[in-house]
Amino acid sequence: MKFENDNEKQVFDKLSRSLGNIIETKCDGYDELYGHKICKEIGSADEVQQYYNEDIAQSLLFKLCKAYQFNYDEIVTHLVKILKWRKKFNPLSCAFKETHNKELEDVGILTWYPEEEPNKRVVTWNLYGKLVKKKELFKDVQKFLRYRIGLMEKGIQLLNFQDEENCYMTQVHDYKTVSVWRMDSDMKSCVKEVINTFQTYYPELLYAKYFVNVPSVFAWAYDIIKTFVDENTRKKFVVLNDGKKLGKYLKQCPGDQFGGSSKSTIFEQNVKKVKPTAYASYLLERQEIEDVE
């Protein structure tokens, strides 16, 4: 953690001191962020001993401070919103309990590039070209959202919040073969809901977003997406009309499809088995017991 001035450090310290009270009084006691326990004042002594990692907790709090420019009131407002949403929506269930439509799972890919540049090691891919004739998959916005959140949560498990070189994710949106397609109202609703959800509940996690194979869909895809995001996020966007130019930015991506050094296909690179954190597993198991009772 690097503070630019004394004020930033003071805001961070104030948040750390107030966290227990904030969670207890404003978040219904829900103490989990991205699969990690963030407060040592909540829960039993055994839970704290087993699942609380101070370095990770502080790194996550620092991300929140950075996301909201070290404005204490803004940070608290968004932290409360995020934790209450996580308790209600249960994104850990999306990733590690629920079964999603197989056709959707073929569109969302997760890759791990250990030798890649900092914060380009965990990459989520959205292969929109595979959905050209599958518009029915967008009819149920909530089903689509839960699938996409599940992919996001799995990707987060591959991050290391104690490592500044692997504490952000990269995304790729591939629009190959989508040139004659038009975004209907159902897809617009899904795209808007996903973007709004990521903006609101996953701050300071995106390192870069690449839009590839987009010459003819630029107007309706990229421009629409830009409308839904803030300026800081837009600065992380890179648009490539040729998919093979992606290899310049992600050197370990598939060579045949994206110009990288790998001989594997994107589907062969797909990381399908991701383990939740010990704390996430504990919460999911506890939920199962509560559901049975």
From Swiss-Prot:
Non-classical phosphatidylinositol (PtdIns) transfer protein (PITP), which exhibits PtdIns-binding/transfer activity in the absence of detectable PtdCho-binding/transfer activity. Regulates PtdIns(4,5)P2 homeostasis at the plasma membrane. Heme-binding protein that may play a role in organic oxidant-induced stress responses. This is Phosphatidylinositol transfer protein SFH5. Residues 100-266 form the CRAL-TRIO domain. It is a peripheral membrane protein. Heme binds at Y128, R148, H173, Y175, K209. One of its GO terms (biological process) is phosphatidylinositol metabolic process. It catalyses: a 1,2-diacyl-sn-glycero-3-phospho-(1D-myo-inositol)(in) = a 1,2-diacyl-sn-glycero-3-phospho-(1D-myo-inositol)(out). It is found in: Cytoplasm; Endoplasmic reticulum membrane; Microsome membrane. It comes from Candida glabrata (strain ATCC 2001 / BCRC 20586 / JCM 3761 / NBRC 0622 / NRRL Y-65 / CBS 138) (Yeast). The keyword Aminoacyl-tRNA synthetase does not apply. The gene is SFH5. One of its GO terms (molecular function) is phosphatidylinositol transfer activity. Keywords: Cytoplasm, Endoplasmic reticulum, Heme, Iron, Lipid transport, Membrane, Metal-binding, Microsome, Transport. One of its GO terms (cellular component) is cytosol. PANTHER family: PHOSPHATIDYLINOSITOL TRANSFER PROTEIN SFH5. InterPro entries: CRAL-TRIO_dom, CRAL-TRIO_dom_sf, CRAL/TRIO_N_dom, Sfh5. The keyword Cell inner membrane does not apply. Its cofactor is heme b. Belongs to the SFH5 family.
